[in-house]
Amino acid sequence: MILTATFICFCLASAFNYFRARRQRSLIKNLKGPFTWPLMGAMHKLLFLTPINFFQRSTEYLTKYGTFSRCWVFHRLFIPLADLELSRQLLENDTHLETGYELMKDWLVGGVLMCQSEQWQKRHSLISGLFDKGNLEQLIDLSRHQTEQLLQKLAKQADQKVFDIWYTVSPIVLDLMVMTTCGAKPSEEYSKNLKDLSEIYRKRFLSLQSANRFNYWLSSPFMRKRQNRLIKRLNDEHNNLMAMHQSQNQLKIENGLDIYQLRPIPLKDHKSLLEILLESKDPQLTGEEICGELNTCNYLGYQLCSPALCFCLVTIARNPSVQQKCLDELNLAQIKDQGWDLEKLNYLDAVLHETMRLYPPQVIVGRQLKKDFPYTHSIVGDAELPCGSEIYINLYELQRNEVRYPKANHFDAQRFLDSPPELLSYSLGPRCCPARKFSMQLLKTLLAPILANFEVLPYGDEVRLDLRLVLGSSNGFQLALKPR
């Protein structure tokens, strides 16, 4: 009796799910995809997917179903995409701007990554103000100051012994991001909270137990409580900073004080993102949204710039000719007592771009369609992707396409000097990264003195790629240093 009732319920649920998605199914008949079981869809494709086997499984999937396909999981329609033709159409479209990053909603809610499409343009303009010419120069000066601390730490490890560069580089990047956004050097507790919270979300990614919000609420109550506690601690710090800035502004108005005299960071000339958001006096910009913006920029800056720098150093170490070319360029571009002219470091810029082509820090770019998306395609024809589709662009596979990039798996910085190909690591169109120029300048500011002061040696194991929200290495970023 119980088995019969269960079977009937399963059949009814399957029928309901099928008929509810009839229109969606009719619009994607031209797309290949895995076999779809009743109710569960192609759940078997995700069941054993892990951060470590993601890249092997992804390559196998694309080989079998193509770079533009469909995959049903229960009632959800996924569109795995590694096709530049359609990716460009989607990313450059100014209507479909929803990113669909529900996993991090508790932490990054209200930030630029998750704000509504109608708010995006205004928020993008505010953040872009952080990187205008005058302020950008001050941020680069701040980066140079942090680089001095980085060199001191690296000098202690320059004994030609293998170590993981991540644990030296990432704290410096984190400090830089927080000083850029909040205008204050983070305390040890703040840094630890941000790292711990990032690690919780990294563990949740690709986990059937905790990726879904309901499953996470049900199966991981202790982790969920810890996550919420860490979010509260970070936001309490942000609220304290907001209150401090508001009181300083009041003092400045009443007593003519210079607000910058009260700032607790070594270099006081740059304007922080927090100041820009507060000075905008936008009545629609709430305290919660400001916290979300600070959390978003701190997280993205820390989690994307740190692996980019580490992958670049490991790659340079294993390509001696590339390292020598970088050194020659640094010698030519050096300014006495002022570091380097970053604009003249074209080859180093190409090395960074080629590294991010092979190892894009953000492997997956998502879009969630709120309405039908008409497209044209040279292979599958002209059609529409239905409303409700969840599109995930796989940059790792897309940027290793042999048709687009000759010898795609081979490191060749020269390709970005001759006729630079399109790079999607910073996205395209209206939702592209507003910090693109700053992040490239930051990476060059950190890389240049490292290469000038140390020979980077290819010791240790090769990186073993894994995907936990951002691209990483399961065995770290191993290399050795030798003083020049």
UniProtKB/Swiss-Prot annotation:
This is Probable cytochrome P450 316a1. It holds the Pfam family p450. It comes from the Eukaryota. Its EC number is 1.14.-.-. The keyword Endoplasmic reticulum applies. Keywords: Endoplasmic reticulum, Heme, Iron, Membrane, Metal-binding, Microsome, Monooxygenase, Oxidoreductase. GO terms for molecular function: heme binding; iron ion binding; monooxygenase activity; oxidoreductase activity, acting on paired donors, with incorporation or reduction of molecular oxygen. May be involved in the metabolism of insect hormones and in the breakdown of synthetic insecticides. Heme binds at C433. Disulfide bonds: none annotated. Its cofactor is heme.
